[in-house]
Amino acid sequence: MKRIFALFLLLAFSLSGLSLNYTISVKLNPNKKTIQGKEIIIWENNTESPAEIIPLHLYINAFQNNKTVFLSESGGKHRNYRLKGKDIDKYGYCKVLAVTVNGEDFSKNFKYLTEIKNPEKLNVFWPDETTKIRVKPDNTIGIIFLKQPVKKGEAVKIEINFETKFPHIFARTGYWKTFFMAGQWFPKIAVYQGERGWNCHLFHLNSEFFADFADYNVSITVPEKYIVGATGIKISEQTEGKKKTYKFKAENVIDFAWTAWNYWQVAYDKWNNVPLTLLYPPGLKHTVKRQFKALKAALNAYGDLTGHLYPYPHFTLVCPPPQAMGAGGMEYPMLVTGGFPSYKIPKGMRFPEMLIIHEFGHNYFYAIFATNEFENAWMDEGINSFATAYGIEKGYGMQIDLPFLKVPPYTMERLGFSQYKGKEAPSKASWEFISNGVYSTLSYAKPTIYLRTLENLVGEKKFKEIFNLYYNKFAFTHPTPEDFFSCVKEIAGEKYYNFIKQAITTGSRLDFAIYTAKSELEKPLSGYDFKFNPVKADKEKKENKKKETYINRVVVENRGDFKNLPVEVLVVLKNGEKKTFKWNGEGDWKAFEFKSKSPISYAFADPKKVYACDNNLANNIKSFTSKTNKAITKTSLALASAIQFFINILTLGI
């Protein structure tokens, strides 16, 4: 009877449309910083290739000891936060206690990666992930060895008992006193890609996640005074004795996260009939309106960009306590963490707003598209960083809007990338970059400014058509880089397809420069005229002085790697007159010569700032007075260095 019921469940699930389903129940022990959990996973193979193993992500084992891949690469530091606490208390783990498959005990068939001889031969992760001396396979991956392959259309029911201990929070998930942020907290099935096998990379410092869409039913039992926020919608809340159980349901999502704290303050709002919940710590009530305003700006902007409103039935914004900001700035489906400091920030300093918009935006460029964050970080971080700036521009106008300082969106990303002198491309796996800073620059900043340039080149209407097509074709799938590029090609054509593909897949830079801008008084004729008559010098000088004509020469140069792109050149004369020239981009440089009654004041390449990705704006303008030009250059470089300092502090890895 039990076996028949199990088969009935498998059949019912296979007819539901999704190939993955999680039913999870957990009990939180705040004193021990642990949860005891049980999950039932039903997984269906929807590929042509039989599956002989089932890998599980056990991400929280990244905090098991100081020799894991994550802690080896990070040294216990993430963004600006460090792993702290008493020696054993600061670490965490996810321990698999028992496994059954289709009702049969499979506990002996489960192995952590560290228990497997030559785990590289399983082909669940790439060989280059563990080539460094200090970086070896760890327990962030576990393998269930099946007795029989799961063929196409077949489903398997897996039951797992597990214990998770939270680490002291410094990187996304963990605890601070009685506050808990549960991200990547349960055993999660990797993504099966048929002939390519399982995609189940190790958990690196810079890599995030990749998962299949699933339905989740989750019960969370906590002490009665605790408030829980989670992915999905709350189905029920029941108190029994000194315990309270929350039940949540989420459909068609790629992850499930939750938070619990006995000091949460709660605020509610609505957007387009979508309920919005804000969880924030005591003392930050003055930020509530500001946080909801940013969230609504994000909802509006992403709907406008893609042509599709937020599709889920609820959204929760979590503002962690200031002492636990390691939990801030992280995305999960239907729930994200932002962050406000305990002190008041001027309304014109919109870094908290930027963080909220960015993290919400990952519900599109990560959660809805489910791109592979391990291998193509730019597809979520880069596209989403562009969309963040788009949201700031639409919702606020300026990123920084103070009486003495105005900084428009996209500026920090352009300045950030302009400081990078290497030749790496964004299209690399997250662990393959030479440094954390280069990963951030190429995964966030470079795609942002090249997408902004693409928008300027094709126009906002056509640009939004690209994203609308991308959503229509690839939402709720796992699009590849070529899928995105193909949408650019279909809407904007081959030229712009080549442009954005070159930007992402190579180390190319774009750099227009004014090579020279000079004026010379036209000299009077001397010697013999063209009829071989001697020229009367005094007469020529008098006539020339009356005319006083200048011969002007402006040379614009393409110093970058992108060819055949048009650029406009503005020439401003000292009398205020303006002249505009256009170069079609053919060749390496173009000279413009003309006569005028006034000399050149300055020449400006790309005055409308079409090329937001121009690598060096200092050389876009050249004054006829060289000393002025030197002063402009020094000022620009000083400003770039100062803003880059703040970029490193505020935007690395959000």
Which positions does each model-derived feature cover?
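Solvent-exposed beta-hairpin/edge-strand motifs
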Residues: P55-E115, P119, N123-V124, G183, ...
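Beta-strand-rich binding/interaction modules
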Residues: A230, Y497, L510-D606
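Amphipathic alpha-helical substructures
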Residues: Q399, S440-S526
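N-terminal, polar/Ser/Thr-rich
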Residues: F13-Q36, K77, W176, Y497-Q502, ...
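Acidic/His/Gly-enriched intrinsically disordered linker/tail segments
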Residues: E381, S385-I449, T453, L457, ...
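Catalytic Zn2+-binding segment of zinc metalloproteases
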Residues: F360-N376
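Hydrophobic helix-coil surface modules that form long, contiguous segments used
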Residues: I189-W198, L205-I357, F386-A389, M398
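Extended, low-hydrophobicity, Ser/Thr/Pro/Gly-biased non-transmembrane segments
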Residues: K77-Y93, L97-A98, E104, R134-K136, ...
